[in-house]
Amino acid sequence: MASESAGPAELGFVEAAPSWRLRSEQFPSKVGGRPAWLSAAGLPGPPELACPLCGRPMAFLLQVYAPLPGRADAFHRCLFLFCCRTPPCCCGLRVFRNQLPRQNDFYSYEPPSEDPPSETGESVYLHLKSGAHLCRVCGCSGPKRCSRCHKAHYCSKEHQSLDWRLGHKQACAQTDNLDNIVPDHNFLFPEFEIVIETEDEIMPEVVERDDESEIIGTMGEAHEEELESMAKHESKEDRIFRKFKTKISLEPEQILRYGRGIAPLWISGENTPKEKDIPDCPCGAKRLFEFQVMPQLLNYLKADRLGRSVDWGVLAIFTCAESCKLGIGYTEEFVWKQDITDAA
């Protein structure tokens, strides 16, 4: 996905894909499953991936592969978004950025093959080239390990207990085959590839005109004076939501809008951030908008539960304007959550 977008947004859509296409060496953009980590070193640890509100481990939501043209140190660059899916919280959000030069310790200098590998099994990859171990439940850094087999790794006691109840108790002795017998913990979101299309620059204006014509047409024989009066009384909230609906009506299945430095598409006039609300990067640079997650993604997550569940109107991600290089690890960036208001 290209960065430094000066034109229209790039739109993301979910598609089913074979598991090999969603592995780290393919540099995927994807939703759900386990993270396809970019750098195999310096992963965010359990404290960084704990919900800032309830303290429980967050689930991987999506990642966007977004290298920066002309930046040798960001030839590979990816953003990873996590959310809390534990009722009744379901509020915590965190996003991390990682980037690598083309010549690095983890990947070939040449582009990855488009052909499937000879072995395309469904084994879960729980060990990285750096030697780091991943949690069997969530695929994040797993510094804890089973005290019996010393082979199964976890991010937390909570995930260790969950895995024990759902099968590791019986599989613990089968230490040579643990990666092939990872149960479904009902913790991960469904996994999809994110495919990208560029939004048409002209069509939004056409749709907006059609939208206005439809509104006027449904008013029947209303007098011109009445129409002018209604236009004057249309609230800012109404205009913002109408713009949102008009934009997404072109591609109603879009789950993501990407454009580094463009303006976000808000769903509401309420709870939109001012410049002072977006914290600067620790390096001192300002943060700018990079992409947003649309509410349409919720339709694919199978996250509905009785009581509170994962929900949002817009998740807007702001990243360091300099895309600074702070070591080989993962740098936390900023997420702004805008909920769907009653007015919308």
UniProtKB/Swiss-Prot annotation:
It comes from the Eukaryota. GO terms for molecular function: DNA binding; zinc ion binding. Keywords: Apoptosis, DNA-binding, Metal-binding, Nucleus, Ubl conjugation, Zinc, Zinc-finger. InterPro entries: PDCD2_C (IPR007320), Znf_MYND (IPR002893). It is found in: Nucleus. Coiled coil: none annotated. Its main location: nucleus. Zn(2+) 1 binds at C135, C138, C155, H159. GO terms for cellular component: cytoplasm; nucleus. It holds the Pfam family zf-MYND. Ubiquitinated by PRKN, promoting proteasomal degradation. A zinc finger (MYND-type) spans 135-172. One of its GO terms (biological process) is apoptotic process. Zn(2+) 2 binds at C146, C149, H168, C172. May be a DNA-binding protein with a regulatory function. May play an important role in cell death and/or in regulation of cell proliferation. This is Programmed cell death protein 2. It comes from Bos taurus. The lineage of its organism: Eukaryota, Metazoa, Chordata, Craniata, Vertebrata.
